[in-house]
């Protein structure tokens, strides 16, 4: 484990049995509240793409907005919010995606992506990958080229990374936690 990984892990609060028994919730709000850890996480997520053409960063509601906005700023890119259905005010495009216990829908503004835009997809954590897979498919349907999908945390036992890789998306994560 690198010093960076150790620092990030120590900046994340783990809450047992939330939101339900048997789940270990990884709360990044403590990382966000720690200026040094927050900067290091953003810098590390941005580093591989500095000097790469990135037109937009797409953040998945809600923590992906925080991380994605900071990454977009550092890359001088635009930002695309990907939101739950009914939360955006203009003409939207929508996709249904699978959750652990059902189906939900997310959407983005129809004019948020120009075909050929190079986009980085961002969220705080990848677990089963249903939400990230839905967001990636939505971006691809609109003609975006996904440069990468970036997450602070990977829960590898849940297989989300494989879903994105099956779509041809390069996945970048900073730390892993075993279990869920």
UniProtKB/Swiss-Prot annotation:
Molecular function as annotated in GO: adenine binding; adenine phosphoribosyltransferase activity; AMP binding
UniProt-listed Enzyme Commission number(s): 2.4.2.7
Enzyme class, broadest EC rank: transferase
GO cellular component: cytoplasm
InterPro entries assigned to the protein according to its UniProt record, in alphabetical order: Ade_phspho_trans (IPR005764), PRibTrfase_dom (IPR000836), PRTase-like (IPR029057), UPRTase/APRTase (IPR050054)
Pathways involved: Purine metabolism; AMP biosynthesis via salvage pathway; AMP from adenine: step 1/1
Compartments it resides in: Cytoplasm
Catalysis performed (reactions): AMP + diphosphate = 5-phospho-alpha-D-ribose 1-diphosphate + adenine
Annotated GO biological process: adenine salvage; AMP salvage; purine ribonucleoside salvage
Lineage top rank: taxon: Bacteria
Keyword Transport: no
PANTHER family assigned to the protein according to its UniProt record, in alphabetical order: ADENINE PHOSPHORIBOSYLTRANSFERASE
Oligomeric and partner information: Homodimer.
Family of this protein: Belongs to the purine/pyrimidine phosphoribosyltransferase family.
HAMAP family: Aden_phosphoribosyltr
Protein known as: Adenine phosphoribosyltransferase
Organism whose genome encodes this protein: Sinorhizobium medicae (strain WSM419) (Ensifer medicae)
């Amino acid at each position: 484990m690198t010093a960076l990984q150790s620092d990030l892990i120590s900046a994340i609060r783990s809450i047992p049995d939330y939101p339900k028994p048997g789940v270990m919730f990884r709360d990044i709000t403590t990382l966000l509240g720690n200026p040094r850890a927050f900067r290091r996480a953003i810098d590390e997520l941005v580093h591989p793409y500095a000097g790469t053409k990135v037109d937009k960063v797409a953040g998945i509601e809600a923590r992906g907005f925080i991380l994605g906005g900071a990454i977009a700023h550092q890359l001088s890119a635009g930002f695309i919010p990907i939101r739950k259905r009914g939360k955006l005010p203009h003409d939207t495009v929508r996709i249904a995606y699978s959750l652990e216990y059902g189906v939900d829908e997310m959407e983005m503004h129809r004019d948020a992506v120009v075909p050929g835009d190079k986009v980085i997809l961002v969220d705080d954590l990848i677990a089963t990958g249903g939400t990230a897979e839905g967001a990636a498919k939505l971006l691809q349907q609109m003609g975006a080229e996904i440069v990468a999908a970036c997450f602070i945390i990977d829960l590898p036992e849940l297989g989300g990374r494989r879903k994105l890789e099956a779509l041809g998306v390069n996945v970048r994560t900073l730390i892993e936690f075993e279990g869920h």
